[in-house]
């Protein structure tokens, strides 16, 4: 082979190999860029948390006269409610956590986090009950369907999207620019341990059967000169607690069958809260311990604190409780069923 031909062959082979060599480099560069962005985000969040460390920590507010609360529109009220017929433009998909999520912006420039899947209805109803007794919540609204402009092919939740960007069964959470997330908080390490306010929130998790009590479902927001502690994800509610085979969410038939109070022992009450997997199937021991710890949220709660919460809930009318579920797009039969169970549980608290 002549030197000239050998040179041409080598050059051709090099041209074929170079694109393949560049793929890992581009992938590595992309991963490094994402890692850098995440590190910067965490650094900024840490700086905000340190700057807000001297702000008062609060977990409840005075809800006012219960009779005046509009539980159909909830914490955001009618004035902040999104328009189901409005214009919404896709911003980005969120691949964190379990449920399909993406962000949109409306015609007024308001940003919303859209959640799809099994949780939107349950979360919309649960946040209204929490807000009714004074706990902080996100402004959540439910759409049976709405249209999103520029919606790409989603990585998750494509089964909830129809032709022309029509999205079905969505929860929209308002994302006001004035609210800054400082971080997460643990049920067992926070400024309110031992208070009736935190104990009441523990009871609320059991009342709605919210079994996913991980710390990353709890948020600390900086707003209005306060550090507000809230449960920011209550989507795993209104079903059955239990191991990975038994638990459910947003399932009336399961919610109706579950027991509320497990045991009354003197001055303390244990509520039913099952989360750990069956021991013989627990391949991940760390997860088993994590889930077992979650179950403690519903245990050894002072009877007086549980009764205090029950007295607050008892001030809500049947119509208001029904509005929680009506706002979440449930059928009339489902509204009847969920309302009946909630009222039964409120009566159990009042009878302690």
Feature-to-residue mapping (PLM):
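N-terminal secretory signal peptides that target proteins for export/translocation
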Residues: 1-5
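Regulatory N- and C-terminal appendages and interdomain linkers associated
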Residues: 6-91, 106, 311-352
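Conserved ATP-binding subdomain of kinase catalytic cores across diverse folds
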Residues: 75-187
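Extracytoplasmic/periplasmic, Sec-exported soluble proteins
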Residues: 96, 118-122, 192-199, 210-211, ...
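Sec/Tat-exported extracytoplasmic proteins
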Residues: 106-108, 133-134, 205-211, 346-350
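Conserved kinase catalytic-core segment
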Residues: 122-123, 128, 180-258
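Residue-level detector of family-conserved "landmark" positions at structurally sensitive sites
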Residues: 140-141, 218, 335
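C-terminal catalytic region of ATP-dependent kinase domains
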Residues: 228-352
């Amino acid at each position: 082979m002549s030197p000239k031909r050998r040179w041409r062959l080598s050059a051709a082979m090099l041209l074929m190999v170079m694109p393949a060599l560049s793929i890992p480099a581009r992938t590595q560069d992309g991963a490094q860029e994402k890692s850098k962005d995440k590190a910067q985000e965490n650094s900024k969040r840490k700086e905000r948390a340190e700057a807000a460390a001297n702000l008062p920590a609060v977990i409840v507010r005075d809800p006012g006269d219960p009779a005046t609360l509009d539980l159909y529109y909830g914490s955001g009220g009618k004035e902040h409610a999104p328009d189901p017929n409005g214009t919404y433009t896709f911003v980005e998909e969120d691949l964190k956590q379990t449920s399909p999520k993406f962000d949109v912006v409306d015609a007024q420039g308001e940003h919303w986090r859209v959640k799809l899947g099994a949780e939107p209805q349950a979360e919309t109803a649960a946040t209204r009950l929490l807000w009714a007794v004074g706990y902080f919540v996100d402004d959540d609204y439910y759409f049976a369907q709405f249209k999103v402009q520029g919606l790409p092919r989603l990585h998750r939740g494509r089964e909830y999207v129809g032709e022309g960007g029509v999205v079905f069964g969505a929860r929209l959470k308002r994302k006001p620019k004035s609210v800054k997330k400082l971080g997460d908080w643990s049920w067992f390490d926070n400024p309110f341990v031992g208070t009736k306010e935190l104990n009441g929130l523990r009871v609320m998790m059991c009342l709605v059967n919210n079994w996913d009590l991980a710390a990353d479902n709890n948020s600390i927001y900086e707003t209005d000169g306060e550090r507000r502690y809230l449960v920011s994800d209550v989507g795993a509610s209104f079903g059955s607690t239990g191991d990975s085979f038994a638990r459910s969410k947003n399932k009336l038939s399961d919610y109706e069958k579950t027991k509320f109070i497990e045991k009354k022992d003197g001055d303390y009450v244990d509520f039913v809260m099952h989360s750990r997997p069956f021991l013989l199937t627990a391949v991940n021991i760390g997860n088993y311990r994590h889930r077992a710890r979650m179950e403690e949220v519903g245990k050894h709660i002072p009877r007086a604190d549980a009764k205090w919460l029950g007295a607050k809930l008892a001030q809500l009318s049947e119509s208001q409780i029904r509005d929680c579920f009506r706002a979440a797009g449930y059928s009339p039969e489902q509204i009847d069923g969920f309302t009946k169970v909630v009222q039964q549980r409120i009566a159990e608290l009042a009878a302690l």
